[in-house]
Amino acid sequence: MRIIRTKAGGKQPSAFKNCVAEDKEKELNYCFDRKEVKDHGEGGLFVGKQLVDGEKVIIIEDVMTSGKALREILPKLEAAANVNVVGMIISVDRQEKALNSDLSAVSEAKKEFGIDVYSVVTMNDIIAAIEDGVVDGKEHLPAMYNYRATYGAK
């Protein structure tokens, strides 16, 4: 199985890889994409183990807003190898409308690409945690409610 991160920033994918591999006692490889193809050094569009035809891939992303990052990475994956994207894991689902749709970006990913997206936390979870006093931030709730009313999926 291959883990693809769509951004090089933040925690390195190896931390996630090691956590999953220890739990399942399997070797997992990972790579991440570059903004543009590099023609020197390691070269190529992906850094890390190169993609192989028939390989299963999980995409890791920090946040899903409109689904734009997923739409950008899929053609890159298709150009690199004939892989099978079996899912996507995101830290935060902002529960925002997808591009040109009233569906959430997560629902649109399933409908359009057949990809299940799993989130660690949703915008509703964050709002509920603030409302319940689990985390600070009550002063931000009016802006969050307004944001959700304006951009939130139906």
Model-derived features: positions:
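Short, glycine/charge-rich flexible loops or terminal/linker lids adjacent to PRPP-binding catalytic cores
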Residues: S14-V57, K68-E72
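Short, well-ordered, mixed-charge alpha-helical segments that flank or form enzyme active sites
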Residues: K38-E42, S66-K68, E96-A98, I127-A128
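Short glycine-rich phosphate-binding loop at a beta-alpha junction
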Residues: M1-K7
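Residue-level recognition of the N-termini of beta-strands and the immediately preceding loop/turn
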Residues: M1, E27-N29, N84-G87
